[in-house]
């Protein structure tokens, strides 16, 4: 769509362009004459342009009219703006319409049906030059520059209000308003070394020195702004994820001791506590002192040295091990752990008591339990000793009895041969002599049996033992019936011989 606007009241022509006093009117007249003489060719793009594009072109033309005013303001002669404003607006709209029509001869399009466009006359430098406006807005690409720059203006004003130092999001005010602001490290870039000598080599050297001299291990904390509370939670609770609990308890303690800690805060104490309760807000020396008093444990700070550079004491004297932290890069804390002496849980819940009286009852109970355990172990060991001794004695007694039995059997087998020989010799002698009567021999045999079978042997036999066992026991113990019975019971082979009668009782 091509729109041609004609400036009313312009009486000049292209022949009057040589006048320096009326250059603006002559230029508008020349443009009007050119547009009146040149026939407008058929526009083929209008057939393809939709209603939305037509509305867009109209809106752009309106926007460029205002841009033309802006260009007029930026000129070197602001006094001529009111006189030439109408001319400038008309010229800009005319040029923009030419820029939109791709086949327009004024915009430099090649058309065989249209005559060549004559060059415009030169303009004097003393007046407002509308050609400069055309050079800016004479093309379709330049047509989009005006609104874009105008829209970017307010955004640049808003962004200029941001903090020039790139402060932490948790900072309450900008850097220019931080007079008396305690947490100045919150405005520093996160985890940037504050001195050129710090780096990986220095970190490794410090870690090696502290391990060699003190035996401490550096347990690294997450670098998220909660490093101080993470390190303290790792030392006290054994879990760095309990950092929020340590933070809130620290703020509660500082609020409880407002009269003391407010002396070290140069800003509003309530706003300070409110900000420090937020996540990822740095902790400083004030919070470290509060943590030392709250847990009643001294806090030792190590920073690239084997000795603490700062020590924070609690309220009371205590013998609990200190909380050891390592300070890196001027804004990060890690936990220093002694692997041979764990200090997790020391001082929990007893911040108002001395450390040497904290676990008095528990120590007594532990000592008593240890003593009872030692007594039980001693009794058990004694029982084992006596049981072993008894078994040893029984084994010795058994071996002695077996040895004596073997000896008896050897001796008992020899006397049985002797009486037979004596009986045969007696028989030979008696056969030669007078033979006694049979009545005399029978009582002699009965007496012999009575003398051999004593009362102890008979008692053993009555208990169900064999004659050989009774005779063996009798040969060893004599008439001691109890010893004979015990011996027979011991020498009986397990379940081979049944224990009968009074022996089982």
Swiss-Prot record:
Disruption phenotype: Up-regulated expression of GLP2A/GLP5A due to derepression associated with H2B hyperubiquitination of the target chromatin and H3K4 hypermethylation. Abnormal hallmarks of euchromatin including H3 hyperacetylation, H2B monoubiquitination and H3K4 trimethylation in the gene encoding OSR2 leading to its increased expression. Repressed expression of the AN3 gene associated with epigenetic modification (e.g. H2B hyperubiquitination and reduced H3ac and H3K4me) of its chromatin. Signal peptide: none annotated. Residues 115-124 have a biased composition (Pro residues). Residues 9-30, 159-173, 421-441 have a biased composition (Low complexity). Residues 73-86 have a biased composition (Acidic residues). Residues 51-72, 174-188 have a biased composition (Basic and acidic residues). It is found in: Nucleus; Cytoplasm. PROSITE patterns: OTU, UBA. It catalyses: Thiol-dependent hydrolysis of ester, thioester, amide, peptide and isopeptide bonds formed by the C-terminal Gly of ubiquitin (a 76-residue protein attached to proteins as an intracellular targeting signal). GO terms for cellular component: cytoplasm; nucleus. SUPFAM superfamilies: Cysteine proteinases (SSF54001), UBA-like (SSF46934). Residues 216-339 form the OTU domain. It comes from the Eukaryota. Keywords: Activator, Chromatin regulator, Cytoplasm, Hydrolase, Nucleus, Protease, Repressor, Ubl conjugation pathway. InterPro entries: OTU_dom, Papain-like_cys_pep_sf, Peptidase_C85-like, UBA, UBA-like_sf. Its EC number is 3.4.19.12. One of its GO terms (molecular function) is nucleosome binding. Belongs to the peptidase C85 family. This is OVARIAN TUMOR DOMAIN-containing deubiquitinating enzyme 6.
């Amino acid at each position: 769509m091509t729109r041609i606007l004609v400036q009313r009241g312009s009486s000049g022509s292209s022949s009057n362009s040589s006048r320096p006093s009326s250059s603006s009117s002559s230029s508008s007249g020349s443009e009007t004459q050119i547009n009146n003489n040149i026939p407008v060719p058929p526009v083929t793009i209008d057939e393809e342009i939709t209603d939305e594009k037509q509305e867009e072109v109209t809106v752009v033309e309106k926007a460029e009219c205002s841009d033309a005013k802006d260009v007029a303001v930026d000129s070197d002669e602001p006094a001529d703006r009111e006189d030439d404003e109408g001319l400038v607006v008309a010229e800009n709209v005319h040029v923009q319409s030419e820029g939109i029509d791709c086949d327009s001869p004024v915009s430099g399009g090649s058309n065989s049906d249209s005559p060549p466009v004559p060059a415009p006359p030169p303009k004097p430098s003393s007046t407002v030059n509308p050609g400069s406006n055309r050079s800016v807005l004479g093309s379709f690409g330049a047509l989009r520059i005006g609104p874009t720059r105008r829209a970017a203006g307010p955004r640049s004003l808003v962004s200029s209000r941001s903090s020039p130092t790139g402060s932490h999001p948790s900072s309450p005010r900008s850097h220019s308003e931080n007079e008396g602001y305690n947490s100045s490290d919150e405005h520093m870039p996160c985890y940037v070394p504050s001195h050129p000598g710090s780096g990986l080599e220095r970190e490794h050297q410090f870690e090696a020195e502290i391990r060699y001299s003190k035996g401490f291990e550096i347990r690294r904390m997450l670098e998220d702004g909660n490093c101080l509370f993470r390190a303290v939670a790792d030392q006290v609770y054994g879990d760095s994820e309990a950092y929020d609990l340590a933070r809130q308890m620290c703020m509660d303690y500082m609020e409880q001791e407002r009269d003391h800690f407010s002396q070290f805060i140069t800003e509003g104490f309530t706003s300070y506590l409110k900000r420090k309760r937020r996540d990822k807000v740095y902790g400083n020396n004030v919070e470290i002192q509060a943590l030392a008093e709250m847990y009643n444990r001294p806090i030792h700070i190590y920073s690239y040295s084997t000795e603490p550079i700062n020590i924070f004491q609690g309220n009371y004297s205590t013998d609990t091990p200190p909380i050891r932290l390592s300070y890196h890069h001027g804004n990060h804390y890690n936990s220093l752990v002694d692997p041979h002496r764990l200090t997790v849980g020391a001082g929990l819940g007893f911040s108002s008591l001395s450390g040497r009286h904290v676990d008095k009852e528990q120590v007594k109970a532990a000592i008593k339990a240890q003593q009872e355990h030692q007594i039980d172990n001693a009794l058990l060991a004694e029982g084992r000793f006596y049981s072993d001794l008894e078994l040893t004695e029984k084994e010795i007694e058994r071996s002695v009895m077996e040895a004596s039995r073997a000896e008896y059997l050897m001796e008992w087998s020899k006397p049985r041969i002797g009486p037979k020989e004596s009986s045969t010799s007696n028989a030979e002698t008696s056969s030669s002599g007078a033979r006694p009567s049979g009545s005399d021999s029978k009582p002699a045999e009965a007496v012999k049996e009575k003398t051999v079978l004593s009362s102890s042997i008979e008692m053993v036999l009555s208990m169900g033992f064999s004659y050989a066992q009774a005779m063996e026991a009798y040969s060893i113990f004599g008439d001691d019936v109890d010893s004979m019975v015990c011996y027979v019971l011991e020498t009986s082979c397990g379940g081979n011989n049944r224990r009968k009668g009074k022996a089982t009782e």
